[in-house]
């Protein structure tokens, strides 16, 4: 594929000449340089180079997209930071600078060249002036290494603004020009004098529309940058290329300025017009310090530019290590080990925070810091995303290290950040094993308090208790484990578990850190059975007045949480109503502070003293709100007042005006004490009074308030399907998973009542569809039969997977979201919906999933991608669709099976053809060392695979052999040339003459053309041992050697003679007799076991000499038909010339006769006109073609014009198919479609077109249209860019020339410019 280029308009570059220093006269512009030979102006190129194929630097890099690619309009100026903007800077010594634009990144464009458009139209030709533009300092870069290197001298001044800018370009005012120059030069005192709020963000309208901050940042003027920022400079300001000041600072490596801009809010992921981020700029230039600073401030290294390149793809070799996390990795690890905070923070980035050491235990920084008790380092690493679950070579996590060495604080930190307390290494040792075996008593207690299980055994069958070195520790481990188990059961208010774990010795067990007892945990529990658990604990002897570390009794805890049901139990068992905590507060203080009116009333009724003053000097009333103060001042039990009653009724009726009159902070959460203890919000939510609900929520209504049955207002709204109310409540913080006394959640209510939209709302906000009510039913269990939409909704991922499997597109469309499109079948093979759609041949579903972002290369449990499924079951259309979405055709599963292995093993012929046409590698082996050919079950698939495999990869019995003859060894008379002395393509299309090779050996005449002497096999070049091996009968060699039977003796033997010498198997005798007959008759290729090759019936390849006119004509045709294609170099690579290594003429008598016969038929059917053309053909099956000719089985029905054999008049088009359709997966060695190393092969063929059918749009055909012999696809606006030629019978083409070549990497723009100057 020819190199892609984006055409540019250069008129601004012509106008914006460099201005002389003040006081100097402007030199006249130099005349345009003369054109190089072969680069004459005009639309018709004089050579391939002149044809627009020279490397052309885009505004961003050396290989631009073609014009009209739709991504954006071509810019008027090359894209580069302001320090090198030639529109605003001039040089004091004009003689040293060419009169062309000083902007960086503009590559020379040959006259008449330019990038081809989307429809291959020629772009506007650049002026000669643009040919001498300065180029980037390195290929692929639009930025010079330094401002001075870009052609801006240290004494440069800003241009006059008007002079030389041409009409229509605004001039820069003198004051602004002076400010910009001061920013550029770093003259901070001058900047302070000139800058003000009005011009701090002024734009350089004569240049790149840059701000003063762009200039100061690009030139690294830190003091100026600081002052500009203080004056209000906009760090987000963009120039006309979309660059912000941070881009400039990063491109030129000013790390301090970069840090300053980032601290002032500059976006580290800002993208310019070509989607380049500051990290792209720094990486391209190898600015390591800047890369580190950017990554530390959140730069995303995965962002890709318009060309699909990430910062890593474009990075200078020196910066690649930073982007892979390998930069100074050893120093980072040492800093973590030694506790060197400064060094660590200088190197630490999100990309290396979890790096592993290259040797030793493969530890991460967190492993080392944890093991060496570097608490501050551990904190920093965790704050910066260190993985607490990372494993070293032995499977140890950082928690293992900390526990093994008894580092309590580090252990606490790791647990706080989610470390798995029961993580196991390769020997199944947990952190508790490590701590217990080393007698780390306090660490053991800490681990147990976080759920460590001392009963887990390692690979030796030993538990942590078994490994404890002392009886005291063993006893402590057992005791604390039981105690923590009881605490956990109490937290969950699990009555059965509490009964099971409860024992007298642990009834008052205290959590080591918080000193909470099981009773504290029970009264704090949110579960409905807390009251029963508390009663059980108290009956078994729990201390009702036990205090935790804050001196809070269970009553304090219950009062603070308004768990009024438990308070009744505590009161009954003698809880002290006026017990004081560490702040001198009673339970009444706690309830008052939390605003729990009912709790305060209850405590007062139990005898709490409202007059007690805390250590801070407050009574309970003084700590409460107005409603609490009123209650405590009255100190009498309340009943529903008339005002409260009227408020409740107004809320129920939706009387907003009355609600507004009666509602106050004191009664907004009043209760219906004679009923269910509902609040006004309960009533308004249940009766769908939206306006009342909204008013109550804005005036302090409690969304968590529970009635007598444990229902919150959200239960009411969901039960009755009031969507707006439910949405309001959720928005104001209502819990979607709250359960009533019967463990019904709002989702239970909505599901049971068939409220689809409510269910959807709740699930969207995190409702748990697996929660069970008291009867053990989930919301799904309560859905009525027939409510399939709700069932699907509640089944979640399972429903989407089922719909994909069954091919129900409507269900898939309804259920699919960006979050679940790649969900997994966790109960099965871990398949995605796309796996199932592909395996069950649900094309519409697969297409929908792919359009909406499904991962085309997602692997299931066995490592299979969707293409494996489609290939295994023979779903051709699905496979073609997956390939269209760039699936990996050579993906391997866990057993190294590729999709081609699957298709070959299952006998899927069409799929094998499709995969091979798109670059599937037939030589890949699975774990058993088998290629697809080894697994093939059908003969046609074997043939396909043999044709696609390179000769060196084929088994001996399948290897085709061609005789290679140097043309210099054959006299011209014996090999008539199809070419005249003139090297024109017209001379290549003459009649096909008989190319029999005389003199050398009459290879084209066949064995029958020569008399065989008695007892001699003519033309034979093998012994009996080779012959037997070729037939797979090596085991008979001993018999033949004993009987001294040679091939000429064998030729006269029949069944009886063979039987007499001991060959009893009829099959063996038959194979021997037929093999000799074919050997004598030269019938190659009919027996797959026959390995010998008779040169007189096979293919001869004549090596043409480079000085041969025929060689030169073919090469010239090949070089001159390189075109620019719309794929931007994606399929055939980026190049502008071939390196032709070898051209061989293909001579095969059988194929030639077949071609001539078909040509005669076509001519008779088309009024004696066979319409022959010389055309190019690229294919993975070239080796098979030169031996067997073109085969329709290689055709792909999904081609633009159906299952035909495609040819092109442009070599660059055929080059796109050398490795498969669309370039396949690239060369076999490097998997690179643009590989400049590997050799490629292409055919230059004689093609009999006969009567052609002109077609402008896609048409799927298996045969030529009636009355026609071929199809010509003509270029059109939205169709082909160049003509394609299609035949549907293989014998209509003959492979005349086999061309071996390489594509050549385009030269750097600077080299091209230098070469052009030298030629001039």
UniProtKB/Swiss-Prot annotation:
GO terms for biological process: cell division; mRNA transport; negative regulation of maintenance of mitotic sister chromatid cohesion, telomeric; negative regulation of telomere maintenance via telomere lengthening; positive regulation of canonical Wnt signaling pathway; positive regulation of telomere capping; positive regulation of telomere maintenance via telomerase; positive regulation of transcription by RNA polymerase II. Residues 120-152 have a biased composition (Low complexity). Keywords: ADP-ribosylation, ANK repeat, Cell cycle, Cell division, Chromosome, Cytoplasm, Cytoskeleton, Glycosyltransferase, Golgi apparatus, Membrane, Metal-binding, Mitosis, mRNA transport, NAD, Nuclear pore complex, Nucleotidyltransferase, Nucleus, Phosphoprotein, Protein transport, Repeat, Telomere, Transferase, Translocation, Transport, Ubl conjugation, Wnt signaling pathway, Zinc. GO terms for molecular function: histone binding; NAD+ poly-ADP-ribosyltransferase activity; NAD+-protein mono-ADP-ribosyltransferase activity; NAD+-protein-aspartate ADP-ribosyltransferase activity; NAD+-protein-glutamate ADP-ribosyltransferase activity; nucleotidyltransferase activity; zinc ion binding. Residues 69-82 have a biased composition (Basic and acidic residues). Its EC number is 2.4.2.30, 2.4.2.-. Phosphorylated on serine residues by MAPK kinases upon insulin stimulation. Phosphorylated during mitosis. Ubiquitinated by RNF146 when auto-poly-ADP-ribosylated, leading to its degradation. It catalyses: NAD(+) + (ADP-D-ribosyl)n-acceptor = nicotinamide + (ADP-D-ribosyl)n+1-acceptor + H(+); L-aspartyl-[protein] + NAD(+) = 4-O-(ADP-D-ribosyl)-L-aspartyl-[protein] + nicotinamide; L-glutamyl-[protein] + NAD(+) = 5-O-(ADP-D-ribosyl)-L-glutamyl-[protein] + nicotinamide. Poly-ADP-ribosyltransferase involved in various processes such as Wnt signaling pathway, telomere length and vesicle trafficking. Acts as an activator of the Wnt signaling pathway by mediating poly-ADP-ribosylation (PARsylation) of AXIN1 and AXIN2, 2 key components of the beta-catenin destruction complex: poly-ADP-ribosylated target proteins are recognized by RNF146, which mediates their ubiquitination and subsequent degradation. Also mediates PARsylation of BLZF1 and CASC3, followed by recruitment of RNF146 and subsequent ubiquitination. Belongs to the ARTD/PARP family. Oligomerizes and associates with TNKS2. Interacts with the cytoplasmic domain of LNPEP/Otase in SLC2A4/GLUT4-vesicles. Binds to the N-terminus of telomeric TERF1 via the ANK repeats. Found in a complex with POT1; TERF1 and TINF2. Interacts with AXIN1. Interacts with AXIN2. Interacts with BLZF1 and CASC3. Interacts with NUMA1. This is Poly [ADP-ribose] polymerase tankyrase-1. The gene is Tnks.
């Amino acid at each position: 594929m020819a190199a892609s280029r984006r055409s540019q308009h250069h008129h601004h570059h012509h106008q914006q000449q460099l201005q002389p220093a003040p006081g100097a006269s402007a030199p006249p512009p130099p005349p345009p340089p003369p054109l190089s030979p072969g680069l004459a102006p005009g639309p018709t190129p004089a050579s391939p180079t002149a044809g627009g194929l020279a490397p052309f630097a885009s505004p961003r890099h050396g290989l631009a997209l073609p014009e009209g690619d739709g991504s954006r309009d071509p810019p008027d100026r090359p894209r580069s930071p302001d320090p090198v903007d030639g529109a605003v800077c001039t040089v004091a010594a004009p003689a040293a600078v060419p009169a062309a634009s000083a902007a960086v990144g503009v590559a020379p464009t040959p006259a008449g060249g330019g990038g081809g458009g989307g429809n291959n139209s020629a772009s506007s030709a650049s002026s000669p002036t643009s040919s001498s533009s300065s180029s980037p300092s390195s290929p692929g870069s639009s930025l010079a290494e330094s401002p001075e290197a870009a052609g801006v001298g240290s004494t440069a001044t800003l241009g006059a603004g008007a002079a030389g800018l041409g009409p229509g370009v605004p001039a820069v005012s003198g004051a602004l020009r002076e400010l910009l120059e001061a920013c550029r030069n770093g003259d901070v005192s001058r900047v302070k004098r000139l800058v003000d709020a009005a011009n701090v963000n002024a734009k350089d309208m004569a240049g790149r529309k840059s701000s003063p901050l762009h200039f100061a940042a690009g030139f690294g003027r830190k003091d100026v940058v600081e002052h500009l920022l203080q004056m209000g400079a906009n760090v987000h300001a963009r120039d006309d290329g979309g660059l912000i000041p941070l881009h400039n600072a990063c491109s030129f490596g000013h790390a301090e300025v970069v840090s300053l801009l980032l601290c002032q809010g500059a976006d580290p992921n800002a993208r310019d017009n070509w989607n380049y981020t500051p990290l792209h700029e720094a990486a391209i230039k190898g600015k390591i310090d800047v890369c580190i600073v950017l990554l530390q401030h959140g730069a995303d290294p995965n962002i890709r530019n318009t060309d699909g390149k990430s910062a890593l793809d474009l990075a200078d070799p020196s910066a690649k290590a930073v982007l892979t996390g390998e930069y100074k990795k050893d120093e980072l690890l040492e800093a973590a080990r030694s506790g060197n905070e400064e060094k660590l923070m200088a190197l630490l980035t999100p990309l290396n925070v979890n790096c592993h050491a290259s040797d030793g235990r493969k530890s991460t920084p967190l492993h080392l810091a944890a093991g060496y008790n570097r608490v501050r380092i551990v904190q920093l690493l965790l704050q910066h995303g260190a993985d607490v679950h990372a494993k070293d070579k032995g499977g140890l996590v950082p928690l293992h290290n900390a526990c093994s060495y008894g580092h309590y604080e580090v252990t606490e930190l790791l647990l706080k950040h989610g470390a798995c307390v029961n993580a196991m290494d390769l020997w199944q040792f947990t952190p508790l094993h490590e701590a217990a075996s080393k007698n780390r008593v306090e660490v053991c207690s800490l681990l147990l308090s976080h759920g460590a299980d001392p009963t887990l055994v390692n690979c030796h069958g030993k538990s942590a208790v078994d490994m404890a070195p002392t009886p005291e520790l063993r006893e402590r481990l057992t005791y604390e484990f039981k105690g923590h188990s009881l605490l956990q059961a109490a937290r969950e208010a699990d009555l059965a578990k509490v009964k099971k774990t409860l024992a007298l010795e642990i009834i008052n067990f205290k959590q080591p850190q918080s000193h909470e007892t099981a009773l504290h945990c029970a009264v704090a529990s949110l579960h409905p059975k807390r009251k029963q658990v508390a009663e059980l604990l108290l009956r078994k002897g729990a201390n009702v007045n036990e205090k935790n570390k804050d001196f809070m009794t269970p009553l304090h805890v219950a009062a603070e949480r308004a768990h009024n049901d438990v308070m009744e139990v505590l009161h009954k068992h003698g809880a002290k109503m006026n017990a004081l905590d560490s702040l001198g507060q009673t339970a009444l203080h706690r309830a008052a502070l939390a605003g729990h009116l009912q709790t305060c009333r209850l405590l007062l009724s139990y005898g709490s003293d409202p007059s007690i003053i805390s250590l801070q000097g407050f009574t309970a009333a003084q700590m409460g709100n107005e409603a609490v103060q009123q209650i405590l001042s009255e100190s009498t039990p309340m009943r529903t007042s008339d005002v409260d009653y009227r408020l409740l009724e107004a809320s129920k009726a939706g009387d907003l005006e009355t609600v507004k009159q009666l509602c106050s902070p004191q009664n907004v959460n009043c209760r219906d004490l004679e009923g269910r203890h509902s609040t006004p919000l309960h009533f308004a939510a249940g009766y769908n009074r939206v306006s009342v609900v909204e008013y109550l929520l804005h005036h302090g209504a409690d969304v968590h308030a529970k009635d007598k049955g444990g229902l919150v207002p959200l239960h009411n709204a969901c039960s009755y399907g009031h969507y707006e109310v439910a949405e309001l409540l959720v928005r104001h913080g209502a819990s979607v998973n709250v359960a009533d006394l019967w463990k019904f959640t709002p989702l239970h209510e909505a599901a049971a009542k068939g409220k689809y939209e409510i269910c959807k709302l709740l699930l969207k906000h995190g409702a748990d569809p697996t929660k069970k009510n008291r009867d053990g039913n989930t919301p799904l269990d309560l859905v009525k039969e027939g409510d399939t939409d709700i069932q699907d909704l509640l089944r979640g991922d399972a429903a989407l997977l089922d719909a994909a499997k069954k091919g129900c597109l409507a269900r898939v469309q309804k259920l699919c979201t960006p979050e679940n499109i790649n969900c997994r079948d966790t109960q099965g093979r871990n398949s995605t919906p796309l796996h199932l759609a592909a395996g069950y041949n649900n094309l519409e579903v697969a297409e929908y999933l792919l359009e909406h972002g499904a991962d085309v290369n997602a692997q299931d449990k066995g490592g299979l991608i969707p293409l494996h499924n489609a290939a295994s079951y023979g779903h051709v259309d699905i496979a073609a669709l997956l390939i269209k979405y760039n699936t990996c055709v050579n993906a391997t599963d866990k057993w190294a099976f590729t999709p081609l292995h699957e298709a070959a093993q299952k006998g899927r012929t069409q799929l094998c053809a499709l995969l091979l046409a798109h670059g599937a590698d037939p030589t890949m082996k699975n774990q058993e060392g088998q290629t697809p050919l080894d697994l093939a079950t059908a003969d046609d698939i074997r043939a396909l695979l043999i044709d696609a495999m390179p000769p060196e990869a084929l088994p001996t019995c399948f290897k085709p052999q061609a005789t290679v003859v140097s043309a210099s060894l054959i006299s011209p008379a014996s090999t008539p040339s199809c070419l005249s002395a003139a090297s024109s393509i017209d001379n290549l299309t003459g009649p096909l003459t008989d190319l029999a090779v005389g003199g050398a050996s009459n290879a084209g005449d066949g064995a029958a053309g020569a008399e065989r002497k008695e007892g001699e096999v003519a033309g034979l070049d093998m012994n009996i041992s080779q012959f037997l091996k070729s037939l797979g009968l090596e085991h008979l060699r001993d018999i033949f050697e004993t009987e001294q039977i040679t091939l000429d003796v064998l030729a006269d033997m029949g069944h009886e003679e063979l039987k007499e010498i001991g060959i009893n198997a009829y099959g063996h005798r038959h194979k021997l007799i037929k093999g000799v007959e074919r050997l004598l008759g030269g019938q190659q290729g009919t027996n797959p076991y026959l390995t010998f090759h008779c040169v007189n019936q096979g293919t001869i390849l004549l090596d043409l000499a480079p000085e041969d006119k025929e060689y030169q004509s073919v090469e010239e045709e090949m070089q001159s038909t390189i075109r620019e294609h719309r794929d931007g170099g994606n399929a055939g690579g980026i190049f502008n010339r071939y390196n032709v290594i070898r051209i061989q003429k293909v001579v095969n008598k059988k194929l030639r006769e077949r071609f001539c016969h078909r040509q005669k038929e076509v001519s008779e059917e088309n009024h004696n006109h066979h319409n022959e053309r010389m055309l190019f053909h690229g294919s993975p099956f070239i080796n098979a073609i030169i031996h067997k000719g073109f085969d329709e089985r290689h055709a792909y029905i999904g081609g633009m014009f159906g299952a035909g054999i495609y040819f092109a008049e442009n070599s660059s088009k055929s080059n796109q198919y050398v490795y498969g359709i669309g370039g396949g997966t690239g060369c076999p060695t490097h998997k690179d479609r643009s590989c400049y190393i590997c050799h490629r092969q292409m055919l230059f063929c004689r093609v009999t077109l006969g009567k052609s059918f002109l077609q402008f749009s896609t048409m799927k055909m298996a045969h030529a249209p009636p009355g026609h012999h071929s199809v010509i696809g003509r270029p059109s606006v939205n169709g082909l860019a160049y003509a394609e030629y299609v035949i549907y019978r293989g014998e209509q083409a003959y492979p005349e020339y086999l061309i071996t070549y390489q594509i050549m990497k385009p030269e750097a723009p600077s080299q091209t410019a230098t070469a052009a100057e030298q030629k001039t």
